[in-house]
A protein has these predicted regions:
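Short hydrophobic "helix-edge" motifs at membrane interfaces and signal-peptide entry regions
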Residues: 44-46, 142-145, 157-158
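A cytosolic-side transmembrane-helix exit/cap motif
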Residues: 60-68, 139-143, 177-180
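Transmembrane alpha-helical segments of integral membrane proteins
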Residues: 136-150
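Interfacial loop-to-transmembrane junctions
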Residues: 147-168
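Juxtamembrane boundary at the C-terminal end of a transmembrane helix
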Residues: 172-185
């Protein structure tokens, strides 16, 4: 069977997408219950950004690992220079982007008339939520890539949909934990 047959792609994708729908419904329910009492507009603005950035970082790493597995430059085990460099690049990119966006949140908070301390707390909440999310991104993507490849599934059909769903849930939970702890919502 060809790696890129329509039948294989559909057979592997539909169950994965169904699982993603269930995870997405769980994430939505978690957010709905948790955000009901939160009055902070800035914290609510952080949710789609954290989900989007986290998902994008996961997609980048997932695509790179999927290609590396297909090309044979990465073996499905937790060693090797190519895997290590990809993980390091993902972590450094994550730190950079979450730090940059937290500065933007700080500026927005100050422009909205929020005091310096509260603006700093919001920026800190975003960067910490991103740092809590980063290991989830790396572990979920690497695990999904290796497991799907070992099971004979195409990582391109499995990793990104499931990883982004997991990342959405983890992003919401990490932001809620940090926002409640740091911002005091």
């Amino acid at each position: 069977m060809s790696v890129y047959s329509i039948r294989r792609i559909m057979l592997e994708s539909y169950p994965i997408l169904f699982i993603c729908v269930l995870i997405g419904l769980f994430a939505g329910g978690t957010l709905e219950k948790s955000l009901t009492g939160i009055k902070g507009t800035l914290v609510i603005m952080m949710v789609p950004l954290l989900n989007g950035i986290g998902g994008n970082l996961g997609c980048i790493l997932g695509a790179r690992l999927g290609s590396a597995l297909h090309l044979g430059t990465v073996e499905p085990r937790l060693k090797g220079r190519v895997l290590r460099k990809n993980v390091h690049a993902s972590v450094l990119t994550s730190i950079g982007i979450f730090l940059f966006i937290s500065v933007i949140f700080f500026v927005i908070a100050c422009m909205w008339g929020m005091g310096f301390v509260m603006a700093a707390k919001h920026a800190l909440a975003f960067i910490l939520a991103g740092m809590l999310l980063t290991p989830v991104i790396v572990v979920s993507v690497v695990t999904l890539a290796f497991l799907s490849f070992q099971k004979g599934l195409d990582p391109d059909n499995v990793v990104i949909p499931i990883a982004t769903s997991i990342i959405d849930v983890a992003a919401a939970i990490s932001l809620l934990i940090v926002a409640i702890t740091i911002v005091g919502l």
